[in-house]
């Protein structure tokens, strides 16, 4: 895993403001107005570890005994995994390697609680992901897109093995493109309830959607063939 130094990151997003125009709304009437509001905030980042690559099919299958994807190449990222699958994998990997479990996970209620003082594997936060992706770079990407990423314009409509493109300054591969990556955070709980954040773009994504600051969202039990994940680990004193 790669050591990520402390620092600060500025996050920005455009959120939907939904307001009822009339309390006498009936189905079929134009009762909702949506306005995009820019939200900007800064987050301090403590040092942590982040995986050099997204979790591969080989590693995922070895740890879980399950095969969710339809690919057969061991070095390709695991796909067709939900946020809940990713959280469960983190705990299983922690146990396999002798670390404490970072998550308390209830399969029945699907509730997840973090044990912040443990050294187990976890998903990166939204802020950690962007900070690590940019790696001191200033632009939307840390390099030319064809040099660093598999996206719709060069992927031939398929997933590729990890590590084939150039890494960023901190030695992280495929932070942009190939697969979207699950992050820990809720997107906007008030509006979207339990939707979780995905980052980075994918092999199927247009160029404009593949960047360090691009943020999307999805349900925690959703899975598809261009979403995977990357693991992190806290540095516990």
Language-model segments: residues:
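Residue-level detector of short, conserved catalytic/binding motifs and their immediate flanks
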Residues: 41, 48, 76, 121, ...
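Short loop segments at secondary-structure junctions
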Residues: 7, 201-203, 234-237
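A short glycine-rich, aromatic-capped structural motif
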Residues: 1-69, 74-94, 176-177
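Short, structured beta-strand segments at or near domain termini in extracellular proteins/domains
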Residues: 225-237
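Functional-site microenvironments in short loops/helix caps that host divalent-cation chemistry
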Residues: 10, 18, 72, 83-216, ...
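Short non-domain terminal segments
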Residues: 1, 25, 46, 58, ...
């Amino acid at each position: 895993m790669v050591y990520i130094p402390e620092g600060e990151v500025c996050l920005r997003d455009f959120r939907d403001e939904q307001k009822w125009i009339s309390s006498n709304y009936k189905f079929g009437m134009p009762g909702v107005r949506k306005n995009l509001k820019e939200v900007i905030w800064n987050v301090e980042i403590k040092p942590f570890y982040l995986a050099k690559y997204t979790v591969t099919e080989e590693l995922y299958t070895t740890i879980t005994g399950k095969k969710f994807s339809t690919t057969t190449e061991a070095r390709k990222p695991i796909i067709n995994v939900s946020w809940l699958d990713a959280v469960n994998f983190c705990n299983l990997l922690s146990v396999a390697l002798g670390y404490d479990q970072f998550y308390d996970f209830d399969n029945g209620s699907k509730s997840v609680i973090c044990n912040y003082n443990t050294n187990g594997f976890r998903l990166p936060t939204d802020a950690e992901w962007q900070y690590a992706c940019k790696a001191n770079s200033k632009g939307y990407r840390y390099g030319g897109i064809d040099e660093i990423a598999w996206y719709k314009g060069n992927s031939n409509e398929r997933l590729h093995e990890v590590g084939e493109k150039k890494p960023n300054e901190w030695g992280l591969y495929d932070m942009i493109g190939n697969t979207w990556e699950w992050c820990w955070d809720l997107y906007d709980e008030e509006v979207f309830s339990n939707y979780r954040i995905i980052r980075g773009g994918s092999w199927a994504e247009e160029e404009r959607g593949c960047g360090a600051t691009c943020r999307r969202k999805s349900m925690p039990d959703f899975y598809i063939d261009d979403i995977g994940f990357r693991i992190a680990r806290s540095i516990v004193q």
